[in-house]
Amino acid sequence: MMASNVLSRLLPQTGQSVYETIRQHDNDSDASDVEERAGLVYDDDVNLGNRFSDRELEEAMADATREGSSSPSDTFLTPQIAQRGERSASSGPRMRKPNNPRFMRSVTPRPEFVEDDLDDDHDDDVPASLLMEGQHDDEYLRTRLPPPPSHHFSDPQPSRSARSPRREHIRTFAFVVGFTTFLTNCIDYRLVRTSKSLDQILISKCTSRMSASSTFLLWLLCLFWIGKIFQLILDIRRLKNMHDFYHYLLGVSDAEIQTISWQEVVSRLMTLRDANPATAGAVSAFNRRLLGSQSKQRMDAHDIANRLMRKENYLIALINKDILDLTLPIPFLRNRQLFSRILEWNINLCIMDYVFNEQGQLSSRQYTPLAEWKFREFNELWHLFEKRINLSYPYATRYVDQFPKDKTVQVAGFVAFISGALASVLALASILDPELFLGFELTHDRTTLFYLGVFGSVWAFARGMVPEETLVFDPEYALLEVIQFTHYFPSHWKGKLHSDDVRREFAVLYQMKIIIFMEEILSMIFTPFILWFSLPKCSERVIDFFREFTVHVDGMGYLCSFAVFDFKKGTNVIPQGHINQRDARQDPRVDYFSTKDGKMLASYYGFLDNYGGNPRATNANKRAFHPPPTFPSLGSPPFVGASNIGNRQDPIQARVNTASAALGQQSMLGATRLGALGVGDTQSPAPSLLLDPQHQPSASGFRATNHIAPHHRQRLGRPPPAPVSESIIDDNEPSIAAARRPAPRRKSGQLHTNSGSSEALGAGDSNVEDSWGMKSGGEVNDEDAEENVDDVVGGAGVLGLIQQFQKVNKDNRPRAAVGL
């Protein structure tokens, strides 16, 4: 057996090729693929077929071949490698006998092909990126080839940049432990007053005189420190692989790693993916079937974010839906939620690790850990979230300062005046005669310099509590600026941004640092009570949550259903408005299968803000200029002022109509808590270069519907509905509005208002289809075909229609009719 094993390694393989094995495996597994028959599979090819056909993909690839375009990965290769790759690709696959045995070679040999396989595959064009995988035996490539890439590339600072902070943390930890041990056990504080040097107060052999508890704690800290060192040593190989992946495959140098954006990294990952036929998206249907087993390697910005934030998306949904009971089981603190870093670590240990396996100033404020999880959106990486939240701190501080307590300000002003006057007199006297006055004792053993420091500190503290005289009292505007960055706008805040109730609720999320620090200290005492008494009450809801909101995506595994954005249709659905708010709120299914305060829709727009457009362009999150609102024209919709909050333009409109934050709950069922949209025109999101065709936002925005579809766990994998005819409106022409006579089959007259948004053009049984009598195939109902112009315009003719327009313009009334 030993000899046969050695001979099998030395002799070339005579079996079937790799492609033949893949083809045979796919043919055998077509009828028995468990994931294809599973109800939770999210089929990307269904959405992909809606946008591109195989013929279009083949024609695009043929055009690129005729034009002689090089492989996208050539930009990441050195000139020598690129030239050798071109020669190897032009000459076609060749049978090369390995010079050395396999166990003596550092790289994997190139697989040998049988001549029949070459004739069957008809694929002689080998991309240049594949020529890097051990196909050259010269010493140059052997030294330049990187190790197999690691999947831990979420942090855009690999290798040396990643090792430096960890080394500094280990050194800092060692200094803190050693310095604390020295201060607590090696100094005799009773001799400090009578001694003149440090040697007189030091305790010799202090470690041998330590107590048993101190010695045990010191040994534990030393073992922890040694474990951190071993962990860093073991991670050096992984960090080296990460460095090689960035340097050789992505073309990111060590100097560029500090300034490159994450969007640019994702763009280069997609370029590298397209250079590999196993992961390229623009392939024919035949080749896609052959490479079907490699679907796990296909990725874009959405797939990468879902992989990196698999656990975080679940925790975001748990916090958003108020599944976790975080109240203190204490009589006088039952309504207060405690969520510290220690409790977060315990929740990850008890819930997340069980579900998943391993395959400043004294008065300054900051957001609490609970507020961070409320503000964070699905598929939002930590460095992007941290950047967004840090931009909101100046506006949050200004909003909190908008509510000064008058009595506190008066007392602080009086104290600042007294302390400032005394400090000014002492400072002036010290300047006039410093030698005499600085040594002068105002009280026993208290000189002028001591009181100068005390009064100066009191003046600075009291002066900081007094607001500036130039501060404009406008809390509503200040909070709207905060919402621009936090994207947190509960529905019950609407119309109450100036109230003290909203201020108190926001102050719970934005507390002083000293209070957050005290909560972290007290959480070591209260965390066991929450884990023992409060969280067990919601254990059934936690289990139901993971069962109901988990879907299986082909190639990525199990994900949170809210994080799997359906960029075409299905999950993000906006109704047209025949379900009023009261009926929607009374439906418990809508509340259960939905996110609160439009969390999923806000995450969708936030994801497009981060990954939309050109990653090499300027910051996509830069606040755009919004011109002042215009007066309602003849073609204005009837809900002009519906989006005003306190007689202001909603700033969330800047995020491509994120007035959905005020819509209530965005549902996985296909309905929101507020039935009517009525918040202005919704523009279609722009396509992104970092998303595949199946993840691109549709041209008409979200699909519109006026009913609640039954929820099922197979909803994401269902085939798309039949197309519905939509009216084409010219943007350069004003919309014509007139009262339409109802069809004879309707019981009562009803005016179908034009929503003026892309959501109004929908599919299914929408009111657009009913009012115009359209069927799914674009046919016109017979009973509406005989309707003449006089019935539409009321028998007045063209002149009468013009008179109606003039009357509407004169009375300054909004239109209320459908376009002809």
UniProtKB/Swiss-Prot annotation:
Processing after translation: Phosphorylated by atg1. Atg1 phosphorylation is required for preautophagosome elongation.
Keyword annotations: Autophagy, Cytoplasmic vesicle, Endoplasmic reticulum, Golgi apparatus, Lipid transport, Membrane, Phosphoprotein, Transmembrane, Transmembrane helix, Transport
Cytoplasmic-side positions: 1-169, 237-312, 334-410, 468-513, 535-820
Membrane-topology descriptor: Multi-pass membrane protein
Pfam families in alphabetical order: ATG9
Intramembrane region residues: 313-333, 514-534
Lumenal compartment segments: 193-215, 432-446
Annotated catalysed reactions: a 1,2-diacyl-sn-glycero-3-phosphocholine(in) = a 1,2-diacyl-sn-glycero-3-phosphocholine(out); a 1,2-diacyl-sn-glycero-3-phospho-L-serine(in) = a 1,2-diacyl-sn-glycero-3-phospho-L-serine(out); a 1,2-diacyl-sn-glycero-3-phosphoethanolamine(in) = a 1,2-diacyl-sn-glycero-3-phosphoethanolamine(out); a 1,2-diacyl-sn-glycero-3-phospho-(1D-myo-inositol-3-phosphate)(in) = a 1,2-diacyl-sn-glycero-3-phospho-(1D-myo-inositol-3-phosphate)(out)
Subcellular compartments: Preautophagosomal structure membrane; Cytoplasmic vesicle membrane; Golgi apparatus membrane; Endoplasmic reticulum membrane
Annotated disulfide bonds: none
Function: Phospholipid scramblase involved in autophagy and cytoplasm to vacuole transport (Cvt) vesicle formation. Cycles between the preautophagosomal structure/phagophore assembly site (PAS) and the cytoplasmic vesicle pool and supplies membrane for the growing autophagosome. Lipid scramblase activity plays a key role in preautophagosomal structure/phagophore assembly by distributing the phospholipids that arrive through atg2 from the cytoplasmic to the luminal leaflet of the bilayer, thereby driving autophagosomal membrane expansion. Required for mitophagy.
Protein family (similarity comment): Belongs to the ATG9 family.
Domain topic, free-text comment: Forms a homotrimer with a solvated central pore, which is connected laterally to the cytosol through the cavity within each protomer. Acts as a lipid scramblase that uses its central pore to function: the central pore opens laterally to accommodate lipid headgroups, thereby enabling lipid flipping and redistribution of lipids added to the outer leaflet of atg9-containing vesicles, thereby enabling growth into autophagosomes.
UniProt subunit comment: Homotrimer; forms a homotrimer with a central pore that forms a path between the two membrane leaflets.
Name of protein: Autophagy-related protein 9
Annotated source species: Emericella nidulans (strain FGSC A4 / ATCC 38163 / CBS 112.46 / NRRL 194 / M139) (Aspergillus nidulans)
Originating gene: atg9
